[in-house]
């Protein structure tokens, strides 16, 4: 620290009580964010009783005092975090209207400060000690705080030697700070509660979509945070995110994150804070830059992950209300979502638990009047619950409804389907037989004889159109071979029968190529178990362009393995006389095979 900067800091050192004396009745007072919340200053201000004072803040570590908490002031907030919810839950606070939520994208908040729509009289922040260049780093919370310090009439700051000095655009002039309050306390730490089984499964599904060399938004929420733990086998990841959290430390140490890390604030432990301290790899910028959709969209393979609370059957997403109460806020989700959609090979993901904490279905026919839409249905691409993944972009209303019902909680799927039929969202003959989670363990990548790779996965009801497309690519001979008679069309009901299975006594596998967002089915196998005999009837379809490459054998081997694993005694199939290719497939393997010929059809029985 230069002599001048040190002298300025010492000359302006005061007690917390003296520092907050600049606050006057009727003032608008900004409170610094997240783990850099200036607790000492907040406590000192709460000791006063100044009429008309409004505290303006984003995500704070602690506002109010006591247990249950109470406050002497009105709070105008851009995010309803844990401490604000605790205040709002106090009846006297709620009835007095002391907590007001402003639904706004966080990247737009600085504009309110600069244009005077939300005038700030005082900004209370926490900073690292001044540097020789006459500036102070805002440390781990730049977010909307920098804009507040530049717009406020007066800035008062806790100066904390434990606060990291961060790179990027995190600094404010010492001259902007009217008084310094020395504190020597550890920077507040925040670790997410351990992920439960539901969040863990959602995180696994999310991680499966992320490729090497992607740029990630971490975001607030347990699922985006847990997702990071499932990326240890990825390479050359970068981060452009509103917030970074504790798992980033491990990804950097493992060499998974090797690209730049740009963020606006950090929430974690001392491990994370030590990592970002004076390290140029980690650039902290104001939120209006980090959350600018144009900046986000300039990142190649940008992945945004938005944790939602509810979604309706057409794809409208709510992120601000949970079980009838304010929770979270608009925050940065919509901006990152739009930016990721504009990114080359980008991906925008919405994730949510299938049920709310109160036990209600999070996937609903309609959003409630207290569930505002944060992301419009036209902008929703990927939706993930613990029961699977749905892709909605470019899909019809009926296709969206079916895809979302498939990943709803099994106990409500029939009810949702009936409601969708009653509303006219889907046709009256729509089928949906799945009653379990999507069997992701059965998904695998395979290589054919010519070196081409494809993915083998269980079918979904939403594969109906793609299965019809496969049917119409078959030759007349192939159709007759598969269905044992000449068939010119595959109706919606027939296609649903092939795709909509219960994953228990019924199973079907699709061999798919192309991006996950718009896969093409090039082969399929079907399995229907008879509980009476313990035998499963099987059948196959292969795209003409993919025949003769071993795909039929791969699909058959997959069904054999599935049947054995699930206790079936064997398989049966009807094959047209002369279909030598399919006969060769059945003759392979360690099993007994009996053949009965009747009416030009060979009835095959394979016992394990």
Where is each model-derived feature located?
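Conserved alpha/beta enzyme-core scaffold
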Residues: 1-431
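Intrinsic disorder at enzyme termini
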Residues: 426-442
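Long, contiguous binding/interaction regions
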Residues: 437-608
């Amino acid at each position: 620290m230069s002599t001048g900067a040190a002298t300025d800091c010492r000359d302006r050192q005061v007690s917390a009580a003296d520092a907050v004396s600049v606050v006057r009745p009727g003032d608008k007072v900004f409170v610094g964010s997240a783990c850099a919340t200036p607790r000492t200053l907040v406590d000192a201000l709460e000791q006063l009783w100044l009429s008309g004072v409004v505290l303006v803040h984003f995500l704070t570590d602690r506002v109010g005092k006591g247990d249950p908490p109470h406050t002497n002031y009105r709070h105008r907030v851009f995010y309803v975090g844990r401490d604000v919810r605790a205040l709002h839950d106090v009846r006297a606070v709620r009835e007095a209207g002391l907590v007001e939520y402003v639904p706004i994208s966080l990247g737009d908040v600085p504009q309110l400060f600069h244009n005077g729509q939300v005038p700030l009289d005082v900004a209370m922040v926490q900073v690292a000690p001044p540097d020789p260049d006459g500036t102070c780093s805002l440390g781990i919370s730049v977010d909307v705080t920098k804009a507040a310090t530049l717009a406020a009439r007066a800035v008062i700051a806790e100066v904390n030697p434990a606060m990291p000095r961060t790179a990027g655009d995190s600094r404010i002039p010492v001259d902007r700070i009217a008084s310094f309050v020395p504190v020597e306390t550890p920077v507040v730490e925040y670790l997410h509660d351990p992920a439960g089984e539901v969040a863990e499964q959602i995180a696994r599904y999310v991680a499966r979509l992320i490729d090497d060399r992607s740029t990630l938004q971490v975001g607030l929420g347990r699922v985006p945070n847990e997702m990071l733990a499932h990326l240890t086998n990825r390479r050359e990841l970068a981060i452009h995110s509103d917030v970074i959290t504790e798992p980033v430390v491990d990804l950097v140490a493992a060499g998974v994150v090797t690209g730049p890390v740009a963020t606006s604030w950090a929430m974690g432990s001392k491990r994370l804070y030590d990592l970002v301290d004076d390290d140029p790899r980690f650039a902290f910028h104001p939120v209006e830059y980090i959350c600018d959709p144009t900046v986000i969209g300039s990142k190649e393979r940008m992945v945004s992950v938005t944790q939602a609370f509810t979604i309706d059957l057409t794809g409208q997403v709510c992120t601000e209300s949970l079980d009838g109460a304010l929770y979270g806020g608009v925050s940065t989700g919509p901006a990152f979502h739009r930016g990721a959609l504009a990114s080359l090979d980008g991906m925008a993901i919405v994730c949510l638990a299938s049920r709310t904490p109160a036990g209600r279905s999070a996937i609903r026919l309609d959003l409630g009047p207290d569930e505002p839409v944060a992301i419009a249905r036209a902008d929703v691409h990927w939706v993930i619950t613990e029961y699977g993944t749905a892709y909605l972009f470019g899909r019809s209303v009926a296709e969206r409804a079916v895809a979302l019902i498939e990943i709803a909680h099994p106990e409500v799927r029939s009810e949702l389907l009936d409601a969708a039929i009653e509303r006219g969202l889907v046709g009256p003959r729509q089928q949906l037989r799945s009653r379990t989670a999507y069997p992701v363990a059965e998904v695998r990548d395979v290589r054919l004889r010519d070196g081409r790779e494809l993915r083998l996965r269980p079918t979904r009801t939403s594969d109906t159109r793609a299965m019809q497309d496969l049917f119409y690519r078959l030759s007349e001979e192939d159709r007759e071979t598969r269905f044992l008679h000449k068939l010119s069309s595959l109706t919606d009901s027939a296609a649903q029968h092939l795709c909509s299975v219960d994953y228990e006594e019924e199973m079907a596998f699709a061999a798919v190529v192309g991006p996950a967002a718009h896969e093409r089915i090039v082969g399929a196998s079907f399995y229907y178990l008879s509980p009476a005999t313990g035998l499963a009837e099987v059948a196959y379809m292969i795209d003409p362009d993919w025949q003769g490459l071993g795909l039929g054998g791969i699909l058959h081997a997959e069904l054999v393995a599935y049947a054995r694993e699930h206790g079936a005694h064997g398989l049966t199939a009807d094959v047209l006389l002369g279909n030598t290719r399919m006969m060769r497939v059945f003759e392979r393997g360690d099993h007994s095979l009996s053949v009965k010929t009747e009416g030009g059809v060979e009835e095959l029985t394979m016992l394990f």
